[in-house]
């Protein structure tokens, strides 16, 4: 008889899957395939949506969107040129940076307001370049006026000269160039003017000849004339300050007194011996080259030249330079404006 209780038999039975295993294996495999298929479909839809958004449309894409979402923009960004014509150029280009620049400047001025009560020579060497002006009117002492060099041009020479001035002082060439860079970030060259003052006419003529070797220059040279010098009464000084501050009501009589000139003898006018040189240019390139020429003269003759820079209220543009101005700004504000932003 066969021993049925013995489980160890000589014949090996083939392994047979249970009914439960056979039922669950096939559906799990199909479920994995379905999940993979759905994932692939979802990815394809996402790629199709992104590719459809990259198609160029009539609407211009701003620079912020182009930087944050480069996949949403095409390589050749086209802007609406109507936005950048006529007076709208500033509204969509450099004036966008004015608010940040002015806010930063006011912040630095408030930060270093403790230095405004000191004379210019006592300012710290670590003073930022942008805080070249102070919010308080300064008074020049009579003793310093007596020690003033007769060949000096203006009151800045009382405090310091180009040779002894720190690199961040208002008289330094570095501060002059810094102000030019700051203005060019906000405005174009048509409303920026460089002013040069000197008692040496030969030096002014040499600078004029050097500037004439630069293209697109507009130069105005002349000697300063002053009228008869008179002192104002204290009542006049107080009244005009009250008029500007608005501490008194603006009546017709007050306005008339504020704008009424002090009568003097016109025949007592005289030449003071100071030659002034005004420099304008239609483009930033030309005016920057002129600024470097002025800086070189100021470094070689530190005690004979005073440099200044002014922001005009309206553009100074000649008829001969209109085409140059338009062609230069066309590359910045119209055709390649989107590419330059990136």
Swiss-Prot record:
Basic residues compositional bias: what residue ranges? 14-25
> Which InterPro entries does the record match to this protein?
Herpes_IE2_3 (IPR005028)
TM ranges are none
Q: Where is this region: Disordered?
A: 1-37
Q: Which GO terms describe its biological process?
A: regulation of DNA-templated transcription
> Which family, according to UniProt?
Belongs to the herpesviridae U84 family.
Give the protein's recorded name. Protein U84
Q: What are the leading ranks of the lineage?
A: Viruses, Duplodnaviria, Heunggongvirae, Peploviricota, Herviviricetes
């Amino acid at each position: 008889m066969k021993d049925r209780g013995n489980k160890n038999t000589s014949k090996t039975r083939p392994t047979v899957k249970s009914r439960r295993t056979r039922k669950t294996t096939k559906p799990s495999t199909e479920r994995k395939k379905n999940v993979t298929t759905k994932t692939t479909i979802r990815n394809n839809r996402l790629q199709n949506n992104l590719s459809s958004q990259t198609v160029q449309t009539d609407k211009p894409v701003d620079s912020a969107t182009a930087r944050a979402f480069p996949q949403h923009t095409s390589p050749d960004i086209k802007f609406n040129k109507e936005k950048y014509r006529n007076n709208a150029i500033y509204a969509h280009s450099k004036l966008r940076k004015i608010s940040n620049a002015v806010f930063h400047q006011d912040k630095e001025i408030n930060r270093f307001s403790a230095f405004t009560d000191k004379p210019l020579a006592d300012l710290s060497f670590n003073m930022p370049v942008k805080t070249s002006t102070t919010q308080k009117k300064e008074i020049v002492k009579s003793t310093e006026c007596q020690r003033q060099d007769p060949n000096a041009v203006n009151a800045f020479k009382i405090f310091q000269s180009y040779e002894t001035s720190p690199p961040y002082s208002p008289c330094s060439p570095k501060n002059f160039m810094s102000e030019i860079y700051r203005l060019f970030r906000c405005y174009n060259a048509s409303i920026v003017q460089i002013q040069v003052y000197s008692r040496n006419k030969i030096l002014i003529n040499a600078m004029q000849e050097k500037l004439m070797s630069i293209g697109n220059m507009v130069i105005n040279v002349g000697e300063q004339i002053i009228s008869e010098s008179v002192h104002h009464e204290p009542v006049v000084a107080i009244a005009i300050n009250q008029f500007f501050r608005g501490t008194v009501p603006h009546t017709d009589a007050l306005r008339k007194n504020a704008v009424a000139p002090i009568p003097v003898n016109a025949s007592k006018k005289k030449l003071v011996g100071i030659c002034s040189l005004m420099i304008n240019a239609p483009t930033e390139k030309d005016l920057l080259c002129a600024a470097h020429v002025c800086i070189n003269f100021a470094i070689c003759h530190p005690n004979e030249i005073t440099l200044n820079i002014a922001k005009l209220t309206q553009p100074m543009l000649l008829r001969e330079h209109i085409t140059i101005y338009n062609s230069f700004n066309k590359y910045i504000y119209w055709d390649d404006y989107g590419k330059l932003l990136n």
